[in-house]
UniProtKB/Swiss-Prot annotation:
Biological classification of the source: Bacteria, Pseudomonadati, Pseudomonadota, Gammaproteobacteria, Pseudomonadales
The protein's required cofactors: prenylated FMN; Mn(2+)
Natural source organism: Marinobacter nauticus (strain ATCC 700491 / DSM 11845 / VT8)
Sequence positions that bind Mn(2+): N172, E238
Assigned keywords, A-Z: Cell membrane, Decarboxylase, Flavoprotein, FMN, Lyase, Manganese, Membrane, Metal-binding, Ubiquinone biosynthesis
GO BP terms: ubiquinone biosynthetic process
Domain of life according to the entry: Bacteria
Recorded catalytic activity of this chain's protein: a 4-hydroxy-3-(all-trans-polyprenyl)benzoate + H(+) = a 2-(all-trans-polyprenyl)phenol + CO2
The protein's role, per its UniProt record: Catalyzes the decarboxylation of 3-octaprenyl-4-hydroxy benzoate to 2-octaprenylphenol, an intermediate step in ubiquinone biosynthesis.
Principal location listed in the UniProt entry: membrane
Membrane topology: Peripheral membrane protein
Protein name (record): 3-octaprenyl-4-hydroxybenzoate carboxy-lyase
Length: 495
């Protein structure tokens, strides 16, 4: 099913039993986080807090709190179907030339579909039903969560930040958290390699004395939100990709203060500017690592206009030690990454980002090994091929007889197929998430690759072990007599 706006999605989730309305009064200061955290860890529904303490605006949380809801938001019925989205992105990232006239004709509908998904700009839109400007702008009227006891203040956690670099047609969409520091001031915490930060840096170099226009959408439709966190090729805009997910063109409307365009159905839109040299210390905040991050300087976004739908819904989340909502998103998007990696490295069988590894800091890869040193090539490929993995600290590579998603299998491979000195690759002075306080320098640290594959001649001079396995014939004979043995053990009985 496709969703034109956030309200369509909320309505469908409620019909499916995937959303719970909370009518009791709940405080956005800490209480919502505790309720959301307990619910998410139990695999529970999305939560719509209808009576946040001190506010008359409902709060939607845990929207993507299960992989199933992520898949639904992408217009799919289950997580497995996300592989097809990954295949589409892999093709768009590096399209294969047609093998002949027939192949070209078969691929033509896909190219037509992409071309038809350019956004549609409307003259008016629901997101501009109510307009608040200048001195009437007051971010404190929005029920922004204060998530953890040690947080520096309220934090906007699901902002869809819309930017454009100088002389660029393509707009960038990104999710960058924002600390509220005044009635019209937010700290824009974007890392230097992210699209929004790159747009800003280019603008500032070209226009050192001019304010930089920014728009922020809160509560867009699910396809647009998820498009902003998916590895979309640079040649395709997130708005166009959202249209592909939805099956219809993304509807936009011109912002009032700049040439940016915002999602027409968004619940709330913030418009304003980042002024030259306007910086502020951001944090500390509890983060997806399970720790409070250190304080650092980031640009300040001055909000000069707020527009919203009638009776708007504020979309929020929290981040903390996994599993949290970003970790769940990582589990689902893992399925999108696999075909993209396999397009470049066909030898990869599976790729897994364990949520307990903060969704991106550790990767397990299984592969069909073809020559000595092959595992190291795959390690380097993971680190360099997609921007999403430039901060991955640990890459474990195993053979395809190992289940990448089963730690018992992975640990067995590490402890039986690795020599620590020979099979560990250390790379120093590489980009590292600045939130990683374990690195010796902020933003710069090392990476470790672990070759847990069976070793080939040239990698070892010793006779290599053969894994123990029972014959299929014996397994079948035992299956046939199992019921007569009287052994009642869950999991031991044949299917």
């Amino acid at each position: 099913m496709k969703y034109n706006d956030l309200r369509d999605f909320v309505s469908q989730l409620e019909k499916l039993g995937e959303l719970k309305r909370i009518t009791a009064e709940v405080d956005p200061h800490l209480e919502m986080t505790e309720i959301c955290d307990r619910t998410l860890r139990a695999g529970g529904p999305a939560l719509l807090f209808e009576n946040p303490k001190g506010y008359d605006m409902p709060v939607l949380a845990n929207l993507f709190g299960t992989p199933k809801r992520v898949a639904l938001g992408m217009g799919q019925d289950d997580v497995a179907a996300l592989r097809e989205i990954g295949k589409l992105l892999a093709f768009l990232k590096e399209p294969d030339p047609p093998k002949g006239f027939k192949d070209a004709i078969e691929k033509l509908p896909l190219f037509r579909q992409v071309m038809r998904m350019s956004p549609k700009v409307l003259r008016s839109a629901p997101c501009q039903d109510v307009v608040i400007e200048k001195d009437k702008v007051d971010l404190y009227q929005i029920p922004v969560q204060h998530c953890w006891p040690g947080d520096a203040g309220p934090l906007v956690t699901w902002p869809l930040v819309i930017t454009r670099g100088p002389n660029k047609e393509r707009q960038n969409l990104g999710i960058y958290r924002q600390q509220v520091i005044g009635r019209n001031r937010l700290i824009m915490r974007w890392l230097s390699h992210r699209g929004g930060a790159l747009d800003y840096q280019e603008f500032r170099k070209a226009n050192p004395d001019k304010p930089y226009p920014v728009a922020v959408a809160l509560g867009a439709d699910p396809a647009t939100i998820l498009g902003a966190v998916t590895p979309v090729p640079d040649t395709l805009s997130e708005y166009a990709f959202a249209g592909l997910l939805r099956g219809s063109r993304t509807e936009l409307v011109n912002a009032g203060l700049s040439d940016l365009q915002v999602p027409a159905s968004a619940e709330i839109v913030l418009e304003g500017f980042i002024y030259p040299d306007d910086m502020a210390p951001e944090g500390p905040f509890g983060d997806h690592t399970g720790y409070y991050n250190e304080v650092d300087q980031f640009p300040v976004f001055t909000v000069e206009r707020i527009t919203h739908r009638r009776d708007p819904i504020y979309h929020s989340t929290y981040t903390g030690r996994p599993p949290d909502e970003p970790a769940i998103l990582g589990v689902a998007l893992n399925e999108v990454f696999i075909p993209i990696l396999q397009k470049q490295f066909p030898e990869i069988v599976d790729f897994y980002l364990p949520p307990e590894g903060c969704s991106y800091r550790l990767a397990v890869v299984t592969m069909k090994k073809q020559y000595p040193g092959h595992a190291k090539r795959v390690m380097m490929g993971v680190w360099s091929f997609l921007r999403q993995f430039m901060y991955t600290k640990f890459v474990i590579v195993t053979d395809d007889d190992v289940n990448a998603r089963n730690w018992e299998d992975v640990i067995w491979a590490i402890t039986t197929r690795m020599d620590p000195a020979r099979d560990t690759t250390l790379v120093e002075n590489t980009p590292i998430d600045y939130l990683d306080f374990a690195s010796p320098v902020s933003g710069l640290g090392s990476k470790m690759g672990m070759d847990a594959t069976n070793k080939w001649p040239g990698e070892t001079d010793r006779e290599w072990g053969t894994a123990i396995a029972m014959t299929d014939e014996v397994k079948q004979r035992v299956d046939d007599i199992w019921d007569s043995l009287g052994i009642e053990i869950p999991g031991a009985r044949p299917d």
